[in-house]
Amino acid sequence: MKFMKKSLVGIIMGSSSDSRIMHAAAEILDGFDVPHEDQIISAHRTPTRLEEYAKHAEKNGFKVIIAGAGGAAHLPGMIASHTVLPVIGVPILVYNDKQQKKSAFGGLDSLLSISEMPTGSPVVTVGVNKAANAGIYALKILAIESSSIRKMLKSHKEKQHKSVLKESQDLKR
């Protein structure tokens, strides 16, 4: 398996249908000029590839992995079981491709699968379909060692703060 060497974050998902959600994590990282590598790796259909990816992630320069999955959502936990890198899990609300209906559990199945990992293989879990929050959390992890990312995150928070103040002022008019 070939991996890019300069990426700091691995963004993986169980299938191409997850990409519309996981794109939000990539957009956040792109906004901070943080290189990432995006791949589809299925815990159930490509288990050998999953193991290889996880075992080589640190050697290939990754600092954190964002893993999105729907349904039984084993991908984040399986990745976490094969690496010491932090793994951020994104539960994805699954849609039935043929009928365009949401899963019967509304994403709760994925949320519980990812958040209820056994002791020793933890996965940080964000809300259902909240890949952007996974991107922000990955930046916070990277900011521990990178003063430039830390500075950009502080600026981002300040912009959010000002935006809310402006919205509040506009509401009073």
Task: List the predicted regions and their residue ranges.
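Structural motif
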Residues: 8-11, 37, 44-55, 63-65, 85-88, ...
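Short, solvent-exposed amphipathic alpha-helical segments in soluble enzyme
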Residues: 25-30, 55, 82-84, 140-142
